[in-house]
C-alpha cells in the first residue's frame, strides 16, 4: 500500500496510479526521485549526489520495471558440471537450465501498450519520410566515431533478435509521401507471436542468446559454434589477412552474420584474434589443456573482456559526464575502485565492490532476459554515415590529427557479401584507422541513413532476401506491432513525467511544426522512436534521458544476473591467468594495442578508441572523481 494521493500534492496527476502500487518505502524513494526530476537537477548534481540519485532510480526500476514473459519450465542441474558457457546459453542460471537460452522469451520492462491508436496511425512511411529521413548528415562531433557506431551493432548481434513468422506483410506508402519514399511499397515478415501459456497471451522469442556471452563471434547454438571453430588448440577460424574467413558463398564465417557490414565484421575479426591470443596464452601456461578446455576458457575470458569494454569504455563515451564515468566504474569495480578490488576482491557487496564477482547472481526475482523496450531504445541507425571516409595511411605527410583522405566509399558497397571482398582489398588497419577518424551520426530527427531506406536485408544464414525494405518505416511498425508503448505512455511506465506540450520535448520550431502535422497535434500519439530522437539531450549524452533510464536498469542486469560474472568469476573457472587478462584490460585501445602494437601510437591522439581519433585527449583533472562538482 503506497502513500495516499493527497500526501503528494506535487506529484504529476498521471503518476498517482504508479505510486499507489508501491510499498511505503519505495513510495518515499519515488517522491525524492520525482522531486529531483521536476526540478531537472540530477545531472547538475555533484558526482556523489548524482550517483545516489541514479542508485535510487535503479532500485525503483528493479522493483517495478522487470516483467517476466513466458513459462518457467526449466530443470535444475549441477553447476559444477557446467562451469563454461554453453553454445545455446543454457545452464547459466543456477537453478533453471533454460533461462537466458536461445529460443527463450523476450521480456518486458512494462506492460504492453494500451494505446487506442492503430498500427498504421500515423502511417510508418509518413513518419519515416517527414521526421526521420536524413536531409543532411548531422555528425556527433568528436565524442563518438564509426568504431563506436559499429560496436553497438556488435553488441546487439550478441544479445537479441526476434523470431519472425512466415506470414508476409506489405506496407504501401500513402500518396502524400510516396514521391519522397525510396520504396513506394515493401514486404517483410511479421514478428512471430508465440503462446506463453498465460491466459492466451503471446510473446516474442529471442533467436540469439541474451547473455553477454560473445555469441556474436561464437554462434547461438551447436551448429553455429561448430561452424566457427578450428577444433585445434581451442581456436576460431580467421583468414590470413586478419579478417573473417568467408565460405564458398562469400558469406563471412562468424557467430552472427545477419545484416553485417565491414565495420561490424572488423570488430568480429578483432575479437576472434583476441580469443585466439587467449588460447595461445593458456596453452603455454597449461599444456595439459585439450582443445575443448582451451576453447571454453578462452570464450569466458573474451566474453568478459567484451563486457568490460562496453561497460567502462563505450558507455562512458556515450554518456560523457563525470557522474556516469563514476557510475559505470562502480558497476564493475564498486565504490572503492579498481585498486582496492584488485587487492582484496569482491568482498564488500555490490555497492563497494561492484556487480562483477558477487557471490551469487541476482535477478531481482524476475528470470533474466532482454526486453522489448530495451530493443526499442537501442534503435540507433542514425549513427551510421552515408559513406566511409577512407584515410591514406601511405601519405608522406602523416598527420595524426587528420590523416589525408584517400576517397569516400558509399555504405552500400560495405554491406552484405560484397563487404568482405572490399574489406580484404583495403586491409584491417586502413579500415580501422578510417573508422576511428570519422565521426558517426547524431541520434536526432532527420538523420536516418538514406541507404537504409532501400536496403537488402539478410536471413540468419547471411543470404540476401528477395525484397528491399525501408528500415526507417519498418522500425516504427515494429515497435507498434510488438506492443511497445508510445512515448508518453513509455515515460509514465518508467516513472517519468509525461510531456504535455511539444515545447517540452524540443526547442526546434521546425520539428514542432512537423510533429504537430504528422501526429495531428495529439501528443499521446507520438511514437517512442521519434520522441527519443527529438528529445532535448543532457549535456554530454549522445542519447536521450528516457532511453538512458532503460540503460540504467539493463546495463546492471546483464552483469549481476550472469553466473559467469558473479559466482564463477574466479580463478577456478577462468584460471588465474585468464582472470588477470580480464582485470588488466580496461579499454578497446588495450585490445587493439595487443594485436596492432603501433597502430594507436601512430594514428590516435584521443583517450578512447571510441572517440574521434584526431581529437584531444581528456584533460587532466586533479580533483578526485567522486569529489567533482556539478558540470
Curated annotation (Swiss-Prot):
Biological-process GO terms, alphabetical: fatty acid biosynthetic process; fatty acid metabolic process; leaf senescence; long-chain fatty acid metabolic process; oxylipin biosynthetic process; response to oxidative stress
PROSITE patterns with a match to the protein in the record: PEROXIDASE_3
Presence of the UniProt keyword Metal-binding in the record: yes
Tissue expression from the record: Expressed in seedlings (cotyledons, young leaves, and hypocotyls), flowers, siliques and old leaves.
Keywords: Dioxygenase, Fatty acid biosynthesis, Fatty acid metabolism, Glycoprotein, Heme, Iron, Lipid biosynthesis, Lipid metabolism, Metal-binding, Oxidoreductase, Oxylipin biosynthesis, Peroxidase, Signal
Active-site residue numbers: 378 (proton acceptor)
Binding site for heme b: 157, 381
Cofactor(s) annotated in UniProt: heme b
TM helices/strands, residue ranges: none
A single MF term (Gene Ontology): peroxidase activity
EC numbers, comma separated: 1.14.99.-
Signal sequence, renumbered to the chain: 1-20
InterPro entries hit by this protein: A_dioxygenase (IPR034815), Haem_peroxidase_animal (IPR019791), Haem_peroxidase_sf (IPR010255), Haem_peroxidase_sf_animal (IPR037120), Oxylipin_biosynth_metab (IPR050783)
Glycosylation sites: 583
UniProt key word Ribonucleoprotein: no
Matching CDD domains: PIOX_like (cd09818)
Marked site (Transition state stabilizer) residue numbers: 258
Family, as annotated: Belongs to the peroxidase family.
Role of this protein: Alpha-dioxygenase that catalyzes the primary oxygenation of fatty acids into oxylipins. May be involved in the senescence process.
The protein, known as: Alpha-dioxygenase 2
Organism of derivation: Arabidopsis thaliana (Mouse-ear cress)
